[in-house]
Amino acid sequence: MGDHLEKSQHALLNEGDENEMEIFGYRTQGCRKALCLIGSIFSLGMLPLVFYWRPAWRVWANCVPCSLQEADVVLLKTTDEFKIYSWKKVIWISLSALSSTSGLTPDHPLITDEGYIINRAIRKPDLKVRYIKVQKIRYVWNNLEGQFQKIGSLEDWLSSAKIHQKFGLGLTSEEQEIRRLICGPNAIDVEITPIWKLLIKEVLNPFYIFQLFSVCLWFSEDYKEYALAIILMSVISIALTVYDLRQQSVKLHHLVESHNSITVSVYERKAGAQDLESRLLVPGDLLILTGSRVQMPCDAILIDGSCVVDEGMLTGESIPVTKTPLSQTASSVPWKMQSEADPRRHVLFCGTEVIQAKAAGSGAVRAVVLQTGFNTAKGDLVRSILYPKPMNFKLYRDAIRFLLCLVGTATIGMVYTLCVYVLSGEPPEEVVRKALDVITIAVPPALPAALTTGIIYAQRRLKKKGIFCISPQRINVCGQLNLVCFDKTGTLTRGGLDPWGVVPCDQNGFQAVHSFASGKALPQGPLCAAMASCHSLILLDGTIQGDPLDLKMFEATKWEMTASGDDLHIKEMLAHTIVVKPTDMVGQVPAEGLAIVHQFPFSSALQRMTVIVQEMGGGRLAFMKGAPERVASFCQPDTVPTSFISELQIYTTQGFRVIALAYKKLEMDCPTTALMREKVESDLVFLGLLILENRLKEETKPVLEELISARIRTVMITGDNLQTAITVARKSGMVSEGQKVILVEANEATGSSSASISWKLVEEKKPGPFGSQDTYINIREEVPENGRDRSYHFALSGKSFHVISQYFSSLLPKILINGTIFARMSPGQKSSLVEEFQKLDYFVGMCGDGANDCGALKMAHVGISLSEQEASVASPFTSKTPNIECVPHLIKEGRAALVTSFCMFKYMALYSMIQYVGVLLLYWKTNSLSNYQFLFQDLAITTLIGVTMNLNGANPKLVPFRPAGRLISPPLLLSVVLNILLSLAMHIVGFILVQKQPWYIMDYHSVCPVRNESASALAASPSVPEKTRSNSTFASFENTTIWFLGTINCIFVALVFSKGKPFRQPTYTNYIFVLVLILQMGVCLFILFADIPEMHRRLDLLCTPVLWRVYILIMISSNFVVSLAVEKAIIENRALWIAVKRCFGYQSKSQYRIWQRNLANDSSWPPLNQTSYSDMQGVSYSNPVFESNEEQL
């Protein structure tokens, strides 16, 4: 409908963002509203219920389309594959109350700059603002541009100069009031949802509405026992769900409430500094930060001073981060684009803790409020919890489709029932009641709940192993994983790095290695000074805190650290400046100490950090450390040894982490704060290399071997050096012995030359300089005979990945099919890589330590965080054990949960069909099962089986294939259909045979004399003793036969469908389930063979000859044997299904399988020792299936 609306009636909200929505304008119409009200009354409340389930229908029924400018209601539709509708009322804010007190007039608003959204949102002359609130975010109507725009943040177009000029002196009280009214309070309010609201929301679930319908029907038929049982189970289920939701609400409320009531110091333009409650902050306010351990109540841009911040809540990184002020540059470029590095280094994020605030000189640490409330980084995190992206898992969709098939089956049964009972002359109310009964029998209300029981048990088992899950539906997805990406540092390797040695250099090249294991003191000089000062360590309460790498590097120098600012008398010294001094242990030194006066913090994008230090009694120096290639590029070429590349490879190929150091002397005439980073980081002198050990975790190699043996691809995504990554891949087993590694290098276009891509074979040579293997690049023109075998891996850097994506995108899927090592990857590139794998129809898992992996963890089908920080909320799974052992555990439990869901699906489907067939056969005789017979089957049999059947644990061994990912798959459908046919045949045979028995008498309901005689004796003697006549309207020989066949068959079907290996532990290990089956079978056999009249009367059964009871048992046993044989010999016969696929020429339609087949037949792939150039076309690869995401999850 929305597609036909004019442009003024339709727009995009959050265009280009992850939460992009279509928005449609509607105006409420009185007559339509009245008609809906009448319809609600006459439908007895069903119409409002339908509107509750279908929000779009409510809007279409009550409103008429109109332009967004005139709308009083808007309809929202997500643009993703789910197309979820919601509606919001348009709210008006009146500023007229402020006009008299603050001087606001239509012609002269206080916010005079036309570029500000607040000014454009005020409608003149009545001074009103209209807005909508969507997922806790306000969107105001921009009168000039004619669209709804997000409010609560500073405008993106602001330059750094504009921020300093406009907000550097604070806002006036009038501006604060206007912004406060329009932007709303600065609070992340997560109200504790009242129990009654949770209760109503849960009860209005379609599943419970269907149960309510069923219960009402059963009460009308005097089927009170089972109705009460269903009510009891539903009440318990609803109570548990409401309790769980309430606990989550309380937990989230307590998590955020502390940030809503903080007192902060705000500088107001006229009144000066004053204390203010954080709820009253607005974008543009000027914060004054004092003291330490300050909780940030909003996002703010640091404009003066520096701060050390703990951002663990956002990034999972427990290492303090240094924030630097936004420089005041005379440029109109937006401030985010103006910064060479990540603009986040200037931003203090809401929810983080300012450990230390250091003012520049005698001034104060100042920050301008950037975003408030749910617009902040923490607000976005909380919104991702409140409004998670729905899971479009295929299992759920297939279950819905099958439910519709059952509804179709029920419809056929209803028509059959109507015909039989109408022709029999039954009263109309009885006919309707019996027809409705068929629906509750054919469509089991417990099916959706049964599909989740396996997930619940799996979640409990994972919790015992220290793996926590915030998205239980993802457990089933774990069972489908066929590719897992791993971060390197802290995930595959140990998080801590130990200094191994340094390689100094001078004008003659690299010198001898200084090993820290020797115990000798590090030679004093610029290299030692660089290690002692080029870091982001801080001194807090007498303890050195910061990056473990920085800490290890500093400790290796044997220098000491103090915080001082008063006794040095150094110009431009910040308060509590960090000072590093040599101790007595290091002997004579050229300097008394160094004061770190300025930092250019480390950035993963820039791969370096720089500090400016002041020598005590000396000059000013700059020290840089970072990735060797990056540092060398900033140095004077003649100071970089000619053997730099080969020397670097010696260590990186051994798996060492290598950091380069450089320095330069600075002029004293320029203030430190005025020095540009570009000027400082130029013409440096190369000092040498710092070598650090980064060993594999003990668990890494066995886990990777287990995954590879299970044919699950493993991929490394790291920010570390490419050579180091290749070595770690070899040592960990990710690249097996004998497999080739092909280095893919791509370079951007420069000048007249096009972008290029080259392929080089990385080979091994032995022995290496430290008794280990070495690697080198094969640049020979000839290709070895085995160079083009199928066992190879591609390795490339983040830079090459970017160039390939931009200029050689048609090659990208080919590279990804065998791409294993991705080094020097930025956080954004990690997310992009995961998405590219998903486009190839891989089910992708991502395992990282949470530091720079949050984006990739969120993008993957299954994200596993090894961090216990709050940032693990970005990941569905969090492991308390900081190693990758959790990955195979998750996959095993996921496979087990998936198979369990299938088992329960099949069982519930068969259970309903068994009852359905039995009841329809009895309807032919205008009979049915009695209430107690239904109760016995529903409660004593099916409910107990449903609770215990899912208790099988996961198989401890990972097999090299996955369970079926769909309910609508040939083996599963064949299993269900064949078992339904077998049950149908058995019931029909029993129904017909019982009527052909010689003792079958229509007028009598019992053939059991005082002493049970044989059927032949009964046939020979028509004058049988006095027989008891039953008063029940249900008791008949057909009823007794059908009930026994159906009840015992339900037990046997559970045994047949309870799967064990290869994905679950054998059924006999599920002791509770086995015990339940034995007890149920014992009770059923007792009822079958015991002649207890009172028991028969209660269950509305008739006593039959013993031989007929044996016949019943033979029929059920035969059905069980055939069913078990079919299940084992056909359904679970993997070799048979593979042969059938080959016979019919079926091949997987997954994109990665198609590419694998194509590349296997391409003799020219992979290219070796070749260089290709871009034709500048850049044809991109697109997977239509992924784009629509119909089959993705």
UniProtKB/Swiss-Prot annotation:
Catalytic-site annotation from UniProt: D487 (4-aspartylphosphate intermediate)
Lumenal side stretches: 220-224, 423-437, 923-933, 995-1036, 1093-1105
Keyword RNA-binding: no
GTP-binding found in the keyword field: no
Membrane topology: Multi-pass membrane protein
Binding site for Mg(2+): D849, D853
GO terms under biological process: intracellular calcium ion homeostasis
EC number: 7.2.2.-
Pfam family, one: Cation_ATPase_N
SMART domains in the cross-refs: Cation_ATPase_N
Domain of life: Eukaryota
Membrane-spanning ranges: 199-219, 225-245, 402-422, 438-458, 902-922, 934-954, 974-994, 1037-1057, 1072-1092, 1106-1126
Cytoplasmic-side segments: 1-32, 54-198, 246-401, 459-901, 955-973, 1058-1071, 1127-1193
Keywords: ATP-binding, Endosome, Magnesium, Membrane, Metal-binding, Nucleotide-binding, Translocase, Transmembrane, Transmembrane helix
The protein's name in its UniProt record: Probable cation-transporting ATPase 13A4
Origin species: Mus musculus
Taxonomic lineage from the root: Eukaryota, Metazoa, Chordata, Craniata, Vertebrata
